[in-house]
Regions:
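Alpha-helical transmembrane segments and their immediate juxtamembrane cytosolic regions
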Residues: 1-235
Length: 235
């Protein structure tokens, strides 16, 4: 539960910056932490759900419900075809994860490696073509947590390196100039996403307090806060 609440709070900060409180960069810096946590929770949800069809169905339902609120908040329009909400990113990712799990059942190492490699390529291409939130980088982030789920020191190191490359090199973007020891250094704003690894690594796979109503709140938060922010922009 704590990871969900953290992710919701960080996402709200980022969306406040992107809609009604521009210029407060600290909001988007800490907001970068949200997506990797959600990506991690998506993978955990895949493995812990009691009914995969219902799990995917809920995400699909809220992806549809969130589209207009997302368009209003991020595009100031009911129709915003150049950017889709993050739940579509998650649906694509779940499809690729499920494909890999089916390949695992076959038991052949070569097939698992082949499907894994094709999944990374498909995630990259489909993420760009569909223009889902975080594009190719978002889907690859989910796959990083899927392929490196072993909770070993080497998987943690690989997660760090992969997320560093995805956020620092692949996404890049705006950077802050720092003076350190007489040298100029640049810190990429998107790089703050790596801070998400600390609470993720502390996760021990134990579910906290859970209820049906709390689950509904988690899902409703995304479209509702976007709708509110989108409407405030027009006031």
């Amino acid at each position: 539960m704590s990871l969900h609440i953290m992710a919701m709070a960080f996402m709200l900060c980022d969306h406040l910056w992107g809609t009604i409180v521009p210029g407060n960069d600290w909001l988007t810096c800490i907001g970068r932490i949200a997506f990797p946590i959600y990506a991690f929770l998506l993978v955990e949800g895949y493995f812990h759900t009691k009914n995969l069809k219902k799990y995917v169905g809920r995400i699909l339902l809220f992806a549809i419900l969130s589209e207009i609120p997302f368009n209003l908040a991020m595009g100031s329009s009911l129709f915003y075809p150049v950017h889709q909400n993050v739940l579509w990113s998650f649906l694509i990712s779940l499809g690729l994860i499920h494909w890999n799990e089916k390949a695992k059942q076959n038991g052949k190492i070569w097939l698992r490696c082949l499907v894994g490699g094709i999944s990374l390529l498909l995630g990259y291409v489909v993420g760009l073509i569909t223009m889902v939130d975080f594009y190719h980088a978002g889907i690859l982030t989910v796959l990083v947590f899927y392929f490196l789920r072993q909770k070993k020191w080497w998987s943690y190191a690989a997660q760090f390196l992969c997320l560093w490359y995805i956020n620092w090199e692949m996404l890049g973007g705006f950077s802050y100039e720092l003076q350190m020891f007489g040298q100029t250094r640049f810190v990429v704003r998107q790089g703050f996403a790596l801070l998400a690894l600390f609470p993720i690594w502390l996760y021990r796979g134990q579910q906290g307090y859970h209820s049906k109503w709390l689950q509904i709140v988690y899902y409703l938060f995304y479209p509702l806060h976007l709708l509110i922010l989108g409407l405030i922009k027009f006031l």
